Amino acid sequence: MPNYKFIAGDKKWWRQAVVYQIYPRSFADLNGDGIGDLAGIIDRVSYLKLLSIDAVWLSPFYPSELADGGYDVADYRNVDPRIGTLEEFDKLIEELHKVEIRVFVDIVPNHSSDQHEWFQAALKAGRGSPERDRYIFHDGLGENGEIRPSELVSHFGPTGWTRVTEPDGTPGQWYLHLFAPEQPDFNWDNQEVRDDFIKTLRFWSDRGVDGFRIDVAHALTKDFSDGLPARSTMDIDPKLPDGSDPLFDRDEVHEIYREWRKVFNEYDIKGKVEQAKVLFSQDVESTFVEQMLVEGESDIDLQFNIMLGETMQIDPQKTFSAVKARQRGKNKGRSVSYTHLRAHETGRNLVCRLLLE
């Protein structure tokens, strides 16, 4: 384990925290190659301290082909060599902890890069293999499987399915991707997938990371028992009961995060110094957040709301409803954080923070 400094204090420090997001590839370029790097962040630690922030949130720094700004992760337990090394990451944690700034990192569990070793193994292994079961593959429709399995769009394009070439060179199965074709979705019913992400959480926690921001937190678990979904948008089907949409906001996703919480609880009790880990998510769908906050789920510590910024100027009623939903959470004793009226997905003309305590 790297030799880093723990920060003592209140385990609920994040209730009042100011968190500063850093996109490492553009924040500071120390070696002058045109790409931001970890060394550049280390060089700016004194500047970050002057901002009086409590934590930084590092957007993906993992090896990636950058089909989606680094959210297509090729290796979850490494640093992209274009921006640094694991040793430099350890140094960054050490320097930030010296000035009592904690560190959150992005974790991207819904999908990997198509260059991830698991997906490459799935392409080589063929139909029905354990390697393919880590992802979501389906046969196509039509006489030769040439028609995609369902009329499902993705967030980034007209279809959520892409066909692969089988090991023998023939056109083959299709894989699901809710985002870019370079981002195949994991199969979270596969125990190997679940175990490997636990391994990833421990890997970064042992290196001193103080918390994780979950990308696409509401989309991990999927249910195709009633057939593959066909839809023209990526919105939750309003006709379905809460927690039963086949793609998003399913009740089962909280089982995953409760398992993660068990891992983090191990760090809460180690040693005599503060090592508590924080788990937070991006608020996309209100039912996901209301279950977490109002029903008192103990899996995710807090969330930030980008939808607030998207609706504030165009739909005051939706903004009011969003605030009321989180106020119900506040009345149940949970911390509710509204942050990022603008984030990495949106234009950055305004950033603010509002805490309801």
Model feature map: region roles:
Residues 2-202, 206, 219-291, 295:
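Acidic/aromatic-lined carbohydrate-recognition and catalytic surfaces
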Residues 339-346, 350:
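Conserved small/polar residues in nucleotide/adenosyl-binding loops
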Residues 350-357:
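Hydrophobic alpha-helical segments, chiefly the membrane-spanning helices
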Residues 56, 212-214:
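Hydrophobic residues within beta-strands of alpha/beta enzymes
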Residues 322-335:
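Glycoside hydrolase catalytic-domain groove-lining segments
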Residues 274, 336-338:
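Short, compositionally biased segments
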Residues 297-313:
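Aromatic- and acid-rich polysaccharide-binding/catalytic face
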Residues 310-322:
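Outer-membrane beta-barrel transmembrane domain signature of Gram-negative proteins
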